[in-house]
Amino acid sequence: MIMSFFDQFLSPSFLGIPLIALAISIPWLMFPTPTNRWLNNRLLTLQAWFINRFIYQLMQPMNLGGHKWAILFTALMLFLITINLLGLLPYTFTPTTQLSLNMAFALPLWLTTVLIGMFNQPTIALGHLLPEGTPTPLVPVLIIIETISLFIRPLALGVRLTANLTAGHLLMQLIATAAFVLLTMMPTVALLTSLVLFLLTILEVAVAMIQAYVFVLLLSLYLQENV
């Protein structure tokens, strides 16, 4: 039976029970746990170095008020990277291709940054809606434009992550299907197609990590405006 290319984005279930929770919980059990030894192994050292560098790059432009968000942003980025990379494995479901999940991350965090700005420094937060030096006739128009751009931020966060991952998965499935069909008819072309698929897979690994970083980076920039 020929299945739709979009069937890979449907949530799988067994006996009516969704398997997303099990698929998400298993990888975290495989993460190494810290030891009491003075020197950690190579994997723990690499993991600690990566987390420290990410926190430094993300929190360096912020003031002290935004540093308390370091743990939340780091956990969110590691969570997104893990899900995105696991979604590249064959016969796996990628939850971050669902707009509902991405919006569930983007909307509350964006709204939190806006509310922090409104409560802590309402004058500065409202001042972002009107650039300095704006001519008087353009004030109403710019306020409307800036307000729309403010409320479209969480939608842009969710759609960006969903669209990039969905497009990559669809392209990989199309190329893999073409390589499988051409295997018996034109083996040479099928080999070249498989090589393209291998290179695209490497690219998608990079995209999976970059998109998780961009998602958290944009949230940190929104927070920086309001802290």
From Swiss-Prot:
Keywords: ATP synthesis, CF(0), Hydrogen ion transport, Ion transport, Membrane, Mitochondrion, Mitochondrion inner membrane, Transmembrane, Transmembrane helix, Transport. One of its GO terms (biological process) is proton motive force-driven ATP synthesis. It is found in: Mitochondrion inner membrane. Coiled coil: none annotated. InterPro entries: ATP_synth_F0_asu (IPR000568), ATP_synth_F0_asu_AS (IPR023011), ATP_synth_F0_asu_bact/mt (IPR045083), F0_ATP_A_sf (IPR035908). One of its GO terms (cellular component) is proton-transporting ATP synthase complex. Pfam families: ATP-synt_A. It is a multi-pass membrane protein. The chain crosses the membrane at residues 14-34, 69-89, 99-119, 139-159, 165-185, 190-210. Its main location: mitochondrion. It comes from the Eukaryota. It catalyses: H(+)(in) = H(+)(out). GO terms for molecular function: proton channel activity; proton-transporting ATP synthase activity, rotational mechanism. Belongs to the ATPase A chain family. Component of the ATP synthase complex composed at least of ATP5F1A/subunit alpha, ATP5F1B/subunit beta, ATP5MC1/subunit c (homooctomer), MT-ATP6/subunit a, MT-ATP8/subunit 8, ATP5ME/subunit e, ATP5MF/subunit f, ATP5MG/subunit g, ATP5MK/subunit k, ATP5MJ/subunit j, ATP5F1C/subunit gamma, ATP5F1D/subunit delta, ATP5F1E/subunit epsilon, ATP5PF/subunit F6, ATP5PB/subunit b, ATP5PD/subunit d, ATP5PO/subunit OSCP. Subunit a, of the mitochondrial membrane ATP synthase complex (F(1)F(0) ATP synthase or Complex V) that produces ATP from ADP in the presence of a proton gradient across the membrane which is generated by electron transport complexes of the respiratory chain. ATP synthase complex consist of a soluble F(1) head domain - the catalytic core - and a membrane F(1) domain - the membrane proton channel. These two domains are linked by a central stalk rotating inside the F(1) region and a stationary peripheral stalk. This is ATP synthase F(0) complex subunit a. The lineage of its organism: Eukaryota, Metazoa, Chordata, Craniata, Vertebrata.
